[in-house]
Amino acid sequence: MQRDHDVASDVSAAANDWEARIAAVWASVQSQSLSGEALVATVDALADERAPGDAPAMFERACARDTAGIEDAAEGYYRAALATGQLDAYRSSRASIQLASTLRILGQLDESEQLLIAELDRHLQPGNPRPLHDEARAVLALTYVAQGRAKEAAGLALSALAPRLSRYNRSVAGNAADLVEKTWD
């Protein structure tokens, strides 16, 4: 029994170590010390440590490619990671939002919009967390702009901004609601 506990502890520690090393890679990107090519190679090396089909590893591969500007290569990894159903709520939201952003960049605007609306609708379900809610609204606003729907984009962006204003927040929220059909407040 103790041996089983030790193995489980070792697996948990290894997963935590992997997460820490992935976080360190992204910190080095923030400090601009890694090129896109080096980022992809580094993340791929770390992802190779995980089991084939590991959702977090596929997600990190997608992120690396997205950050490196090779969105077409990121798309499949995002889709595969999401399809497993094994991402935690935060990574799942990130994957949905980032896939939608990638699709927007690739010109697949309708699918980008559909993904973001589905993500935002999930946030409104009772008991569901709302990680990155405003971020999803921001990317949807960008998708609206790309679709030529600037009025709706402004409404969505202003509805996200309104609660943070020190003054005029009710007025801005009311006007924002007049510009867009749904704000996901």
Residue ranges and their predicted role:
Residues 1-56, 61-72, 85, 163, ...:
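N-terminal alpha-helical interaction modules that lie
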Residues 59-60, 98, 138-139, 174-175:
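"A position-specific structural signal for the A-helix of alpha-solenoid helical repeats
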Residues 117, 121, 145-167, 177:
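TPR/TPR-like (Sel1-like) alpha-helical repeat modules
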Residues 56-130:
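Alpha-helical adaptor scaffolds
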Residues 37-44, 75, 82, 113, ...:
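Tetratricopeptide repeat
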Residues 32-37, 72-73, 101-111, 142-153, ...:
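Alpha-helical linker/edge segments of TPR/alpha-solenoid repeat scaffolds
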Residues 121-153:
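Ankyrin-repeat and related helical/solenoid repeat scaffolds used for protein-protein interactions
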